[in-house]
From Swiss-Prot:
Subunit comment: Homodimer.
Entry EC number(s): 3.5.3.23
Catalytic activity: N(2)-succinyl-L-arginine + 2 H2O + 2 H(+) = N(2)-succinyl-L-ornithine + 2 NH4(+) + CO2
Binding site for substrate: 19-28, 110, 137-138, 212, 250, 359
Active site per database record: E174, H248, C365 (nucleophile)
Main enzyme class: hydrolase
The keyword Heme belongs to this UniProt entry's keyword annotation: no
Keywords for this protein: Arginine metabolism, Hydrolase
GO biological process, one term: arginine catabolic process to succinate
A GO molecular-function annotation: N-succinylarginine dihydrolase activity
Protein name listed in UniProt: N-succinylarginine dihydrolase
Superkingdom of origin organism: Bacteria
Length: 447
């Protein structure tokens, strides 16, 4: 059956700032306390979406979350009106404010893990929300992510959205950022590659930085998504590269159809894994980048592998890269050799995503890939699909509500909270989402 990969990109939120919250993510740590530009960040993301949509790649949008997230501050013992809660946090424990104001939901590669209908036992598209247990600021995302996905994939005959796994370290799950799908045409059954960093009883694990994904979580997600057991491979990421800043597999590998583009040191027992994929995926092609040409350090600093590998109708592929790749002579030299070599990659497309990159999120972090048949595409909430009208409406919305300068101190401003809620109220109507945010359901307005 014919099917297409639709990229659902996260829209950057109004509180996008640099707080260095993500230990193990070198860019996040390095840019801590810098001044951010939320308006520019949102527009950089929107331009990527629109450019790819105009080039014929189906594209949709996932909205930001409510931030600062007052309900969690109340859980932590701060009481009073919303303004009083903010004021008490600033006075008593200001470190919490940045965590509950993070715009990290924009990196929707961590929103969920997807199983297309061609791979599932019941013939539905399955989406399992990620619990993001390893980082407090990200663990807050799951309930609203679930509400958003249910509002977008709202036809229960075709889509099953599963709640996140229990919030414990044993079941740490980071979503599609640790998941690849390999195969022929999108509509054919594919091989799902789940990548984990640690498992109980296995001493092979990183020592410097945390392994955020467990094998136990990956196995549970595969079960929830009803993936045919014959179409699953579990592989461990190389713990040495996690210790060098590769906190998700999509920082060291990316797949599309029959191609796996990865670093030579991406996986534990890599030659064994690639042999297994060759045996099980027709026409499988591994493009392994040697460490002698691109070091792990350079891969992390440029986000070479946090790229999007997109298929054209003629079978050729386009590699979508951040500008940092073009600015690194060694990486750009390698990429031009790649273009000239015998493989499906025939074009490089570069985007300026500096605002997201400075927090450790490249092109692949910003998108959730969902393979859909024509019938399934028609069943998706049409208001989220990118086109000229939506692009212009979202650009105007960003101009109206987003600040062009934000520091950590600004997060305490009650006006920022009010601006954010008003903006999300308008956006949820624009995207026909219903009341997906807690502040809408509580009926508390902006007070």
């Amino acid at each position: 059956m014919n099917a297409w990969e639709v990229n659902f990109d996260g829209l950057v939120g109004l509180t996008h700032h640099y707080a260095g919250l993500s230990f193990g993510n070198k860019a996040s740590t390095r840019h801590r306390f810098q001044v951010s530009n939320p308006r520019l960040a949102a527009k950089q993301g929107l331009l990527k979406m629109k450019t790819l949509a105009d080039a014929g790649f189906p594209q949709a949008v996932i909205p930001p979350h409510e931030r600062p997230f007052i309900p969690v501050l109340r859980q932590l013992g701060f009481s009073g009106s919303d303004e009083q809660v903010l004021e008490k946090v600033v006075r008593q424990a200001p470190h919490w404010l940045s965590s509950v104001s993070s715009a990290s939901p924009m990196w929707v590669a961590n929103a969920a893990t997807i199983a297309p209908s061609a791979d599932t036992l019941d013939g539905k598209v399955h989406l399992t929300v990620a619990n993001l247990n390893n980082k407090f600021h990200r663990s807050l995302e799951a309930p609203v992510t679930e509400s958003l996905l249910k509002a977008i994939f709202n036809d229960e005959e075709k889509f099953s959205v599963h709640s996140a796994l229990p919030q414990v370290a044993l079941l740490g799950d980071e979503g599609a950022a640790n998941h690849n799908r390999l195969g022929g045409h999108y509509g054919e059954p594919g091989m799902q590659l789940f990548v984990y960093g640690r498992e109980e009883g296995n001493d092979t694990r990183p020592s410097r930085y945390p392994a955020r994904q467990t094998r136990e979580a990956s196995e549970a997600v595969a079960r929830l998504n009803q993936v045919n057991p014959q179409q699953v491979i579990f592989a461990q990421q190389n713990p040495d590269v996690i210790d060098q800043g590769v906190f998700h597999n999509d920082v060291i590998a990316v797949s599309n159809r029959q191609v796996l583009f990865c670093h030579q040191q991406a996986f534990a027992r890599q030659s064994q894994l690639l042999a297994n994929l060759r045996a099980r995926v027709n026409g499988f092609m591994a493009i392994e980048v040697p460490a002698t040409q691109v070091s792990v350090s350079d891969a992390v600093s440029t986000y070479l592998f946090n790229s999007q590998l997109l298929s054209r109708d003629d079978g050729s592929m386009m590699l979508v890269l951040p500008q940092e790749c073009r600015e690194h002579a060694g990486v750009w030299g390698y990429l031009n050799e790649l273009l000239a070599a015998d493989n499906p990659i025939s074009e490089l497309k570069v985007f300026d995503l500096r605002e997201s990159m400075a927090n450790g999120g490249g092109p692949a972090c910003l998108r959730l890939r969902v393979v859909l048949t024509q019938e399934e595409r028609r069943a998706v909430n049409p208001a989220v699909m990118m086109n000229d009208t939506l692009f212009n409406a979202l650009n105007d919305w960003v101009d109206r509500y987003y600040r062009d300068r934000l520091t950590a101190a600004d997060l305490a401003d009650p006006q920022l909270l009010r601006e954010g809620r008003e903006a999300l109220d308008v956006l949820s109507q624009l995207l026909n989402l219903g009341s997906v945010y807690p502040f809408q359901r509580e009926g508390g307005g902006n007070g």
